[in-house]
Amino acid sequence: RQKEVKMILYIIRHGETQWNVEGRLQGQSDTQLDEKGIRLAKVTAEALKEVPFAFGITSPLSRAKVTAQIILGDRNVPLYEDERIQELSFGSWEGLGCRKENYQIPSEHFDYFYTDPLNFQPAEDGETIQQLCERTKEFYQELIHKEEYQDKTILIASHGCATRALLRNVYTDTSDFWHGSVPLNCAVNIVEVRDGKSRLLEEDKVYYGKEDCVNFYGADK
């Protein structure tokens, strides 16, 4: 009997950064993992140490790339960069506070980013959610139809908003963009792909305790 061929994708959000803690918009600004971010990535790496990754693909931004490097550890496998899975660009709003207590964004409707993301109006030099969905879809569809990847297990290191955009290729209800919230730092979504059909095996799984959770909206949400 022929072995069933399946591709397994581990789609992970990067570890914590100082801007995550401060509630500032990161977008495509190249922030670094903080100490806790490195620790969370190591905890996640330990949990995934038996996973037979053939290779990794990462956003070129350091916070995703270092997370991927930590998770791949001493596996001697390639790590490729792909700009299509970097975070949504917030343009001139990057670095600004986006929580109630530190709000600096020059728009009264930034809350659409959470409440109605597909109608979110970005800064003039920023990106819409639709644009993000288009580039991540192109990446995802190209990946899952590559003949030579059909039996591979692949690590994909990305970002909060970009991860949700990637998963629109998997979710049955694409009108619900956030599926609850921005994924936590180092949250892992595991997707199985057979014959170009995707199925979510694990959603937003974290391998660390509740005391380490920092939600995008602040620690108490």
For each feature predicted by the language model, list its residue ranges:
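Short glycine/proline- and acidic residue-enriched helix-loop micro-motifs
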Residues: 109-131
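Loop-to-helix element that buttresses phosphate recognition and phosphoryl-transfer chemistry
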Residues: 16-67, 125-137
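Active-site signature of alpha/beta-hydrolase-fold catalytic machinery across serine-
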Residues: 70, 165-169
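General small-molecule cofactor/ligand-binding pocket signal
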Residues: 10, 80-82, 201
